[in-house]
Amino acid sequence: MSTRAFKNAALCLAPILTIGTLISASALAADPLGSLVGSTALGKQLKEDYGVKVYGWAQAGLIYNNNSTDDVSKQAFFNTDEGFNLNQFALGIQRSPASNVQGRIGPFPGPMPQEADWGFNVTTVYGKDARYFKTYGWDEDLGVNRDNKPEDEAFTIAQAYLEFYFPVLGGSDLMLGIFHTPLENEIGFALPSPAPTDFYSHTYSFMHGPAKHAGALYSFKLPSAPGESMLGFEVGVVQGWNNLQSENHDPHVIANVRWRSADFGTWVDWENIYGNGGGDSFANCACGSPMPAGTEDDTAQRYETYLTISHQLDPANRIAVETSYGKQKNGALAGFANKTDATWYGANFNFHHKLSENLSWNSRAEWFYTDAPVHVVMANIDSRTGIPDPSWGSFYAVTTNLSWLPIPNLRLRPEARYDIHSGPGRDAFGDGSRDAQLVLSFDATVFF
């Protein structure tokens, strides 16, 4: 990428940095999410009288790689192109029920609220990342997206759900609608801490999981005495991966277990999803499941599981280990490895060190393996011919960054990531010319 191109891209970031400064100067709320509208008379009334918060964030970044192509996939996921990327411009409105258990997060300490309550969430996202939040049968055919190329910005209604709290068992939460997946250590939205969004790029295990679901998710906490550890469970029935309209008409089942230590410093999360993936991937809209398998009339069972253990060592240091395993029957790309089914698994280790109140250092190491190609991002599909030339085998990645919040509403993050691919098929990086690649990035996120 040329110096001139970097200067032009830096000019694109300038408005985001300026907006962050203005928002922080005018915002009165301690929470950066909702601070812009929350500082107005209307926002205060919505929050105080109805418990409703209007919030948003804007994320953009610059990316550079060490080869002659502009291809920064797969290790820069969500990003694919070198240069400037408007990743996410999101707007949301929500009301959270008073509860001691939160769907997708788990149980919390404290007494169980004795009254039922309700809430809702609607989150819209525009940008390069939004294409990964499209839901087949919901927002893939919106007019604003209809003529888009796969690499273009998209608009999605990423979440639209109702939420109900019931004072049963140790506390229960029911979500109905379209919501971000409860699986994986990382999440796709560029939210502020303490959300697990410490890196600009994402892991291979995150890439190989679902982004969102349409259906129902029931979460509950077992009764526990003050000072005891907490145990929660989640059970869900959804329309597969990233689908509202299931072509094979077979629901997927989610089953998760979440344990929290009494001091809330250690978390254990075991997350699972199982169902028929036959015909649930759609090339014409680049949506649905990213793992094509058979047709809607086929049975192509898909299973994925994640186990994440995180621990707060002390006020300044936190670690997390995630392992994952998945299997796709009758994978459409598995034949390139002379297989019928595809299996993938891996592990990643995360270390987070707080240097000061507004500066942290984050590092991550990952190993990931696929015995056959399964994911469309790894398929390297020729845009002219539609013919895949996939990569598979072992992937090794090391990522490190600094996350700085000069003001509560603005996160600045320089990041370096180095990946190595060892395996058959096409070299994974540099448009098929490299088996290793260095990616440097800088992203800015404004919370409002």
Regions found by a protein language model. Name each.
Residues 28-168, 218, 352, 366, ...:
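Beta-barrel outer-membrane channel/assembly domains of diderm bacteria
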Residues 64-81, 131-260, 269-272, 276, ...:
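Surface-exposed coil loops of outer-membrane beta-barrel proteins
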Residues 103, 185, 372-374:
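Short Asp/Glu-rich motifs
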Residues 1-34:
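Cleavable N-terminal export/targeting peptides
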Residues 75-78, 133, 145-150, 262-448:
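Outer-membrane beta-barrel pore domains
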Residues 117, 171, 228-230, 265, ...:
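Short secondary-structure junction motifs
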Residues 85-90, 117, 155-159, 211-215, ...:
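Transmembrane beta-barrel architecture of outer-membrane proteins
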